[in-house]
Amino acid sequence: YLTAMSQLDYRAYLTAFREHMDELMKTEMTPENQKHLNEELKLLRDMLLIVEKPVKHTFTGYSVPSELILLTSPGMEQLTIDVMPRNVRDAAKAMRGGVRILTERPGELFGIRTVKGFMFRFCSNPLKETGYQAVAADIYNAGLVEYLKKRHEGDGPFYFRIDLRTKLVLNEKSQYVKRLGAELERLSGHELQNSASNYECELRVTENKQGQYSVYLILHTIADSRFSYRRNAIATSMHPVKAAEVVSLAAEYLADDADVLDPFCGTATLLIERYRRKKAAHLYGVD
């Protein structure tokens, strides 16, 4: 009946939906009712989130010691280390496609322009087992809920999604993600809630060559103002991180107060990144 109601205007029943959802969360799960309860909970949550967008948590962990992996393009690892603050540079370790670092103040790193993303390492990797129940238990026992609360302000559950990067085929991957998400919800007492569209954090599960899984946390609650000049973009626009990488590679050849011409400027992303790296007298762009 919920599937049918989801196609109608059900706003008059939101209170009843919330009460029923609370009852389901308190219901003891058994092998017999687990599948039905999880499906009903997911449908109710999706229906409520369409009408009532959750209030997102505010990231406050800029000075909370954390172990991070800064994702970069291959070959940009050392250049990324070179632009880090001197007080943390020695602690950074280059790895393929990124830089690993344990830092007292993560906020010092969020402004690095050649970084494509920031992953938090909150549990011991790789995990010992790969079954969804074992992985969920490892994630929960590593203190994910407390880890998130320590770095955020705000009440309510944390909505997450799972990015599974393994050798499983598509239909197996979909089932694994669904079961892993439901198990994390159950273990956390629904302080973690799986949502494919309204998530504020992401669990990236990757498989190595030995078939072992590693889990990292990506926080979408961190405000990224590095490329705030980018008001409009088109499909052919250069990605700003790519532009920052190009400028970093050419840094030693850039002159102060130069006249700079980009004959294929597009939306001028490369010109702007060039100016931010070293001041130019004039910028010219044609396309």
Question: Predicted segments — roles?
Answer:
Residues 1-8, 39-43:
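Structural detector for internal amphipathic alpha-helices that build alpha-solenoid repeat scaffolds
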Residues 13-23:
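Alpha-helical repeat scaffolds
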Residues 29-56:
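Eukaryotic acidic, Ser/Thr-rich intrinsically disordered low-complexity regions
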Residues 49-196:
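Non-catalytic nucleic-acid substrate-recognition regions in nucleic-acid-modifying enzymes
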Residues 189-204, 260-264:
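Short, surface-exposed recognition loops or helix-turn segments adjacent to catalytic cores
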Residues 202-221:
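C-terminal edge-of-domain segments
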Residues 215-253:
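SAM-dependent Rossmann-like transferase core, predominantly class I methyltransferases
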Residues 238-287:
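Conserved S-adenosyl-L-methionine
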